[in-house]
Amino acid sequence: MKKKIAIIGSGVAGLTFANLIKKNSDFQFMIYEKKESLSLDDGFGIQLAPNSVSILNTIDFHKVNSKDIFHPKSMDFFSIKNEKICDLEISKFNSEYSKYTTLKRSTLIEFLKDEIYTQHLRFGKSIKEVTELKGKVLIKFTDNTNDLVDYVVGADGIFSNTRSFFEKKKSQPLFKKAIAVRLIFKKHNLDINEKNISLFMGSNLHLVIYPINQKNELNLVCIIRDKKYDPDNIKSLIERKLITQNSNLKDLFETDLQSWPLYSTSKVLPSSNNKVFYIGDAFNGFLPTMAQGAGQSIESAYELFNLIKDENLDASNIYFKKRFERTTAVRRRSNFNFFAFHFSSSFTQKIRNFFLKFLVKKKYFINSYLGSVYKN
């Protein structure tokens, strides 16, 4: 009898896992999403390093229209005043078919949903109760439906509701006293190469700009340290924290802005049930300062898929150990970047910039710091 999997959440992690299961196994599966629909509006950009692109290629990512993606070759580092510090060639981590890729998140979701939307995705589904029954997991939903499955895969984000039903130990995400602000634009007065990723570092903030398709659209994300999140006064925050450091940036933010508070996982905890797994941000939520959020969601889905596909009897322990080691390495780099990008004094900024110019030329350091993540 075919084994059955319930996937809770239809983000990048859940959809990637579902595609892997559909294409490469005979497991039955269903995705349960608490929202009423997938959000496919033109959204913000994401970055995919070769490590995640190689996985997506196993489910035909190469079929995505080339006009809807971009392959930046370099990352340019600037002061917040738009003074160039140095650059780093990121295309060195590419292989023939797996290249550093930027695109809209909605483009990725659109691709991932195509093969599973009709038969394998149910909306408006919130868990009400879970029980174990004859070696399986019985999930009861608030709409009075239920499902009896062999495995449950929690892919419902950093504030995972799935965890609250299965885990006694709690690990609340930590507010990092920082805000993310995003927008998409075309026209600007900045001195940048629009084909590259541009990173601007200022006092208690940084700003990243990169192309997301072949239509001259650029994604901008600004990370600003602030003690509280006030969504009604984001433009005031931008004016107070960013524009005072570079008034030339003002025009960029005179449009509709998306914003949210930044959280990260405080402590990574294993599943207490060998039939229940967590992937993506439900396993570990990162700061965006390593651009590995989507990448690690894809990686975690792939790691778990291979263990479940082979029906590994020790899948729970093997998965947690490998994923914990991997996320620890990425989290350390993300946290360090969050620290180094935001130096507030001109003295520490000059020291950082000096070492940055030196380190980007050191092949061993770059392979250790970035290559170990990008090429895994």
Language-model features: locations:
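Residues at the starts of beta-strands that form the adenosine-phosphate
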Residues: 4, 28-30, 217
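Glycine-rich FAD pyrophosphate-binding loop
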Residues: 22-42
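C-terminal auxiliary extensions adjacent to catalytic cores
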Residues: 353-376
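Conserved N-terminal glycine-rich FAD pyrophosphate-binding loop of Rossmann-like flavoproteins
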Residues: 37-55
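Conserved FAD/dinucleotide-binding core of flavoprotein oxidoreductases
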Residues: 86-109, 188-259
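Conserved N-terminal helical subregion
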Residues: 3-5, 22, 49-166, 171-184, ...
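Conserved Rossmann-like nucleotide-cofactor binding loop
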Residues: 13, 37, 159
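Conserved mid-domain beta->alpha element of the FAD-binding
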Residues: 6-22, 153-154, 209, 256-340
